[in-house]
């Protein structure tokens, strides 16, 4: 990594797994990750770090829960970005999309805490190396 440019289209074409992010670059203490997403993730929270999303293709919804329990959703389409603030419980869902994320290296894709059992299609990981 860091030895040359990474073509995101080619990187996305190199794997099919959903909710299983690949690390395409590292900068400072952050990973740049890409993922295919479809279906529901799990409600989870990252207590100490924000989470940045960029939709590369498709639609990506992020349900969030405020401190008083009120739920609200951010709907993102191709080219949209969104930052989930640290400490906010959230659950991504998608009918099918490709996304890019900036996350503090070592951040688990299922957060510091999550609710319920993990669905089989959700990979609890700090990211996999590309290729």
What do the PLM-derived regions correspond to, one by one?
Residues 28, 56-57, 77-78:
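A cytosolic small-molecule/anion-sensing beta-strand core signal
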Residues 36-37, 47-66:
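Short, conserved beta-strand element in jelly-roll/cupin
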Residues 66-86:
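Short acidic-glycine-tyrosine-enriched beta hairpin
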Residues 8-43, 49:
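A short glycine-rich, His/Asp/Glu-containing loop-to-beta-strand
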Residues 43-45, 50-55, 73-74, 90-91:
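His/acidic/aromatic-lined binding-pocket segments of jelly-roll/cupin-type domains
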Residues 2-12, 95-131:
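Double-stranded beta-helix
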Residues 42, 61, 80-91, 107:
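Histidine-centered metal-chelating micro-motifs
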Residues 31, 40, 59-61, 98:
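Structural motif
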